[in-house]
Amino acid sequence: MSLLARAISFAYVPEKYVLTEVTVEVERGEILFLLGANGSGKTTLLECLCGVRVPQHGTVLLDGRELFKLSARERAKYVAYVPQFPEAAFAYTVEEMVLFGRAPHVGPFGRPGRNDWERAYRALALVGLDGLSRRPITTLSGGEKRLALIARGIAQEAPYLLLDEPDAHLDPANQHRVLSVIANLAKEGLGVVATTHNPNSALLYGKRVLLLRAGKTLAEGAPKDALSAELLKEAYGIPFQIVGDGVGPRAILPKVEG
């Protein structure tokens, strides 16, 4: 059981591809991190995996079925997507925002039931926002809004969870909380794909990494292999140093000259 992008290419402008023949697969029960410089195609790849974007070439398979042959509601039952910068048009409460994650499981004219509310509150508790459930979403800090959106994705209870920079705009404690929650969800059987600009998030929490450069796959594999100093320099254009403990890499830092 997996979510597979097979040789996909995508262009916003005809023939100017931001993704070129990228193949990547995430299985249920693992975390895959997407890394690369700004403009390397991370978010576009994530959007192709969830059906927001349709690649001009290649295909996306959801547990062996073609993703784009499913209705939007059916896709949402299997793939939850947490974008980076959605803005709430209305001052919904935090609990109402998270409850939207239950929409694929409620009929078009139905109302959320007790089961849906329980799952929304469970998701809020997981990210530590249960004490803010009645607050308008517009009154939260940037980091708290990120946590609320991640809770909405968790409440959706899809077998695949896709997150665009879940560790962005968070203090170290909340970064650890969110990444630990994601890691535990993977242990429970979810397939997780997350973009990040922090190689250490992938090193500490990821099972596999896809490193992109200019819309093409530069490296794929275990973090300790795909995040070498040489490959990171090729991806980002600056030198890196790998700090180890004699057993394996423990931290990745930009190398400061002088």
Regions found by a protein language model. Give the residues of each.
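ABC ATPase nucleotide-binding domains
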Residues: 235-258
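A short, flexible loop at the N-terminus of ABC-type nucleotide-binding domains that lies
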Residues: 1-5, 9-21, 69-71, 89
